[in-house]
Protein backbone atom coordinates (compact mmCIF):
# COMPACT_ATOMS: atom_id res chain seq x y z
CA UNK A 1 0.00 0.00 0.00
CA UNK A 2 1.44 3.27 -1.10
CA UNK A 3 0.34 5.79 1.54
CA UNK A 4 1.13 9.47 1.90
CA UNK A 5 3.95 8.97 4.37
CA UNK A 6 4.90 5.28 4.16
CA UNK A 7 4.79 2.11 2.13
CA UNK A 8 3.24 -0.93 3.78
CA UNK A 9 3.95 -4.23 2.08
CA UNK A 10 3.45 -7.91 2.72
CA UNK A 11 5.04 -10.78 0.88
CA UNK A 12 4.42 -14.47 1.20
CA UNK A 13 4.79 -17.79 -0.53
CA UNK A 14 1.40 -19.54 -0.64
CA UNK A 15 3.17 -22.91 -0.67
CA UNK A 16 5.12 -22.19 2.52
CA UNK A 17 3.36 -22.10 5.86
CA UNK A 18 4.01 -19.02 8.02
CA UNK A 19 5.94 -17.25 5.26
CA UNK A 20 4.12 -13.92 5.61
CA UNK A 21 6.46 -10.96 6.09
CA UNK A 22 5.40 -7.35 6.67
CA UNK A 23 7.53 -4.41 5.63
CA UNK A 24 6.89 -0.78 6.55
CA UNK A 25 9.04 1.72 4.71
CA UNK A 26 8.68 5.28 5.99
CA UNK A 27 8.96 7.99 3.38
CA UNK A 28 11.40 10.84 3.70
CA UNK A 29 10.73 14.46 3.02
CA UNK A 30 12.44 14.39 -0.37
CA UNK A 31 11.96 17.10 -2.96
CA UNK A 32 8.90 15.36 -4.41
CA UNK A 33 6.43 12.63 -3.55
CA UNK A 34 7.79 10.41 -6.33
CA UNK A 35 11.35 10.85 -5.03
CA UNK A 36 10.14 9.92 -1.52
CA UNK A 37 8.56 6.75 -2.93
CA UNK A 38 11.76 5.87 -4.81
CA UNK A 39 13.93 6.42 -1.71
CA UNK A 40 11.63 4.30 0.49
CA UNK A 41 11.58 1.42 -1.98
CA UNK A 42 15.32 1.39 -2.64
CA UNK A 43 16.07 1.62 1.09
CA UNK A 44 14.26 -1.72 1.57
CA UNK A 45 15.74 -4.20 -0.96
CA UNK A 46 13.13 -6.85 -0.08
CA UNK A 47 10.58 -4.66 -1.88
CA UNK A 48 12.42 -5.10 -5.18
CA UNK A 49 12.85 -8.88 -4.98
CA UNK A 50 11.55 -10.98 -7.86
CA UNK A 51 7.95 -12.01 -7.12
CA UNK A 52 5.49 -14.06 -9.17
CA UNK A 53 2.79 -11.40 -8.77
CA UNK A 54 2.77 -7.84 -7.48
CA UNK A 55 -0.25 -5.71 -6.63
CA UNK A 56 0.39 -2.05 -5.88
CA UNK A 57 -2.43 -0.27 -4.07
CA UNK A 58 -2.31 3.51 -3.90
CA UNK A 59 -4.10 5.58 -1.30
CA UNK A 60 -5.07 8.74 -3.15
CA UNK A 61 -8.13 10.96 -3.09
CA UNK A 62 -7.89 11.32 -6.86
CA UNK A 63 -10.18 8.56 -8.05
CA UNK A 64 -13.70 7.95 -9.26
CA UNK A 65 -15.89 4.98 -10.17
CA UNK A 66 -16.88 4.82 -13.85
CA UNK A 67 -18.60 2.37 -16.22
CA UNK A 68 -16.49 0.29 -18.65
CA UNK A 69 -17.42 2.47 -21.65
CA UNK A 70 -15.89 5.51 -19.93
CA UNK A 71 -12.86 3.63 -18.55
CA UNK A 72 -11.97 2.48 -22.07
CA UNK A 73 -12.31 5.97 -23.58
CA UNK A 74 -9.05 7.85 -23.01
CA UNK A 75 -10.56 11.18 -24.13
CA UNK A 76 -13.43 10.79 -21.65
CA UNK A 77 -11.00 9.92 -18.87
CA UNK A 78 -8.89 12.97 -19.76
CA UNK A 79 -12.04 15.14 -19.57
CA UNK A 80 -12.89 13.68 -16.17
CA UNK A 81 -9.37 14.30 -14.88
CA UNK A 82 -9.43 17.87 -16.18
CA UNK A 83 -12.81 18.60 -14.62
CA UNK A 84 -12.03 16.97 -11.25
CA UNK A 85 -8.47 18.28 -10.97
CA UNK A 86 -8.23 21.44 -13.11
CA UNK A 87 -5.10 22.72 -11.36
CA UNK A 88 -3.24 19.58 -12.48
CA UNK A 89 -4.26 19.81 -16.14
CA UNK A 90 -2.48 17.22 -18.28
CA UNK A 91 -0.35 16.13 -15.35
CA UNK A 92 -2.09 12.87 -14.45
CA UNK A 93 -2.45 9.44 -15.98
CA UNK A 94 -5.37 7.13 -15.37
CA UNK A 95 -5.16 3.54 -14.22
CA UNK A 96 -8.34 1.47 -14.00
CA UNK A 97 -9.20 -1.72 -12.15
CA UNK A 98 -12.50 -3.59 -12.16
CA UNK A 99 -14.73 -3.35 -9.11
CA UNK A 100 -18.10 -5.06 -8.51
CA UNK A 101 -20.79 -4.23 -11.10
CA UNK A 102 -22.93 -1.12 -10.81
CA UNK A 103 -26.49 -1.46 -9.57
CA UNK A 104 -29.42 -0.93 -11.88
CA UNK A 105 -31.03 -2.66 -14.80
CA UNK A 106 -27.98 -2.78 -17.04
CA UNK A 107 -25.69 -4.25 -14.35
CA UNK A 108 -22.78 -2.68 -16.20
CA UNK A 109 -19.20 -3.30 -15.26
CA UNK A 110 -17.58 -0.67 -13.07
CA UNK A 111 -13.98 0.44 -12.78
CA UNK A 112 -12.08 2.44 -10.18
CA UNK A 113 -10.27 5.10 -12.20
CA UNK A 114 -7.31 6.53 -10.33
CA UNK A 115 -5.39 9.60 -11.44
CA UNK A 116 -1.68 9.61 -10.57
CA UNK A 117 1.39 11.53 -11.66
CA UNK A 118 3.03 10.14 -14.83
CA UNK A 119 6.42 10.01 -13.07
CA UNK A 120 4.96 7.83 -10.29
CA UNK A 121 3.33 5.44 -12.72
CA UNK A 122 6.53 5.24 -14.78
CA UNK A 123 8.65 4.49 -11.73
CA UNK A 124 6.26 1.80 -10.46
CA UNK A 125 6.04 0.10 -13.87
CA UNK A 126 9.84 0.12 -14.30
CA UNK A 127 10.49 -1.12 -10.77
CA UNK A 128 7.74 -3.75 -10.54
CA UNK A 129 7.43 -5.52 -13.88
CA UNK A 130 3.83 -6.46 -14.71
CA UNK A 131 2.55 -5.07 -11.42
CA UNK A 132 -1.17 -4.46 -11.15
CA UNK A 133 -1.49 -0.84 -10.05
CA UNK A 134 -4.85 0.09 -8.56
CA UNK A 135 -6.62 2.28 -6.06
CA UNK A 136 -6.91 1.06 -2.47
CA UNK A 137 -10.73 0.85 -2.78
CA UNK A 138 -10.51 -1.96 -5.35
CA UNK A 139 -9.76 -4.80 -2.90
CA UNK A 140 -12.24 -3.39 -0.37
CA UNK A 141 -15.11 -3.34 -2.86
CA UNK A 142 -14.24 -6.83 -4.08
CA UNK A 143 -14.03 -8.16 -0.53
CA UNK A 144 -17.33 -6.67 0.61
CA UNK A 145 -19.05 -7.78 -2.59
CA UNK A 146 -17.84 -11.36 -1.96
CA UNK A 147 -19.12 -11.16 1.64
CA UNK A 148 -22.50 -10.06 0.29
CA UNK A 149 -22.66 -13.07 -2.02
CA UNK A 150 -21.90 -15.40 0.89
CA UNK A 151 -24.28 -13.73 3.35
CA UNK A 152 -27.08 -12.81 0.95
CA UNK A 153 -27.28 -10.00 -1.55
CA UNK A 154 -29.64 -7.72 0.35
CA UNK A 155 -28.66 -4.07 0.51
CA UNK A 156 -25.66 -3.50 2.74
CA UNK A 157 -23.40 -0.64 3.68
CA UNK A 158 -19.86 -1.37 4.82
CA UNK A 159 -17.69 1.09 6.69
CA UNK A 160 -13.94 0.77 6.85
CA UNK A 161 -12.47 3.11 9.47
CA UNK A 162 -8.91 4.40 9.21
CA UNK A 163 -6.91 6.92 11.25
CA UNK A 164 -8.06 10.04 9.40
CA UNK A 165 -10.69 8.76 6.98
CA UNK A 166 -13.63 6.44 6.59
CA UNK A 167 -14.42 4.38 3.49
CA UNK A 168 -18.10 3.76 2.82
CA UNK A 169 -19.09 1.08 0.34
CA UNK A 170 -22.76 0.39 -0.34
CA UNK A 171 -24.52 -2.35 -2.28
CA UNK A 172 -28.24 -2.29 -3.06
CA UNK A 173 -28.77 -6.01 -3.65
CA UNK A 174 -28.17 -5.62 -7.40
CA UNK A 175 -24.66 -4.24 -7.35
CA UNK A 176 -22.41 -1.43 -6.24
CA UNK A 177 -24.26 1.76 -5.31
CA UNK A 178 -21.46 3.80 -3.82
CA UNK A 179 -17.78 3.65 -2.93
CA UNK A 180 -16.27 6.77 -1.43
CA UNK A 181 -13.77 7.98 1.15
CA UNK A 182 -14.45 10.79 3.59
CA UNK A 183 -11.83 12.58 5.67
CA UNK A 184 -12.40 12.59 9.43
CA UNK A 185 -10.86 14.67 12.17
CA UNK A 186 -11.19 12.11 14.95
CA UNK A 187 -13.06 9.16 16.38
CA UNK A 188 -16.27 11.11 16.94
CA UNK A 189 -16.66 12.18 13.31
Predicted regions span which residues?
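Short, surface-exposed loop/turn motifs that are enriched in glycine and acidic residues
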Residues: 110-114, 157, 184
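Gly/Thr-rich phosphate-binding beta-strand-loop-beta motif of the actin/hexokinase/Hsp70
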Residues: 1-15, 148-174
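Accessory, usually C-terminal, subdomains that scaffold auxiliary metal cofactors
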Residues: 175-189
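Active-site neighborhood for divalent-cation/phosphate handling
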Residues: 8-146
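Short alpha-helical interface elements
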Residues: 81, 145-149, 153, 184
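A short secondary-structure junction signal
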Residues: 124, 169-171, 179-181
